[in-house]
């Protein structure tokens, strides 16, 4: 698969659309303009990869639409070389955005085929420093904690307590919360060992966050 001038032009158009939708973070927009999203979607959807749409990637999972990726990334308020844990690798696109922004990225996926595919793709695109893990996202990565930021890319029916424990004091977690057809984006800041501050944002639609693993 190639990344052509046509693809680059479509990415520029997409970035303009994201600006119009309210995304203001220039580094995030530049990352989206650089990363070839058509590499991360199934071949069937390649020609539509730069539409602001989600697409199925197998195993009942999706690649989020670019606005959602930009929105969540913006809410993280990333600082240089933040250590970021992503729950739900999926296609690997969100991890690529974080890596392009210069973050230390740890990403975990409960579906082994998706995890292996994302790892190979990220390495092929020059994002080999991203650390990919096959495992249960509800458990996080306690051996690698604490994290400056934690990003959940699936709808959580509850705030995972194990993940809160893995957040640095002063750190932020961004999570779509709820079990209905739409979920509210929430940002949680850890103020102290047992004290957290919660902010609420817009509503989105995500696949559910599930416990356990699938080979």
Residue ranges and their predicted role:
Residues 77-197:
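Conserved nucleotide-cofactor-binding alpha/beta core module
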Residues 1-85, 93-97, 101, 114-117, ...:
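Class I SAM-dependent transferase core
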């Amino acid at each position: 698969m190639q990344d052509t001038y046509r693809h680059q032009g479509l990415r520029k158009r997409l970035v303009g659309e994201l600006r119009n939708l309210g995304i203001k973070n220039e580094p995030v927009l530049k990352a989206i303009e650089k990363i070839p999203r058509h590499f991360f979607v199934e071949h069937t959807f390649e020609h539509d990869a730069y539409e602001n749409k989600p697409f199925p990637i197998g195993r009942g999972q999706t690649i989020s639409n670019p606005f959602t990726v930009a929105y969540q990334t913006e809410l993280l308020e990333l600082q240089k070389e933040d250590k970021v844990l992503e729950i739900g690798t999926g296609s690997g696109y969100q991890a690529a955005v974080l890596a392009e922004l210069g973050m230390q990225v740890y990403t975990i996926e409960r579906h082994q085929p998706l995890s292996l595919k994302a790892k190979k793709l990220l390495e092929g695109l020059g994002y080999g420093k991203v650390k990919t893990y096959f495992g249960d996202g509800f458990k996080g990565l306690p051996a690698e904690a604490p994290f400056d930021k934690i990003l959940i890319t699936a709808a959580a029916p509850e705030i995972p307590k194990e993940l809160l424990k893995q957040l640095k004091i002063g750190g932020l977690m961004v999570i779509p919360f709820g079990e209905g057809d739409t979920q509210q984006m929430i940002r949680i800041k850890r103020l102290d060992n047992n004290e957290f501050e919660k902010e609420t944002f817009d509503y989105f639609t995500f696949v559910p966050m599930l416990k356990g693993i699938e080979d």
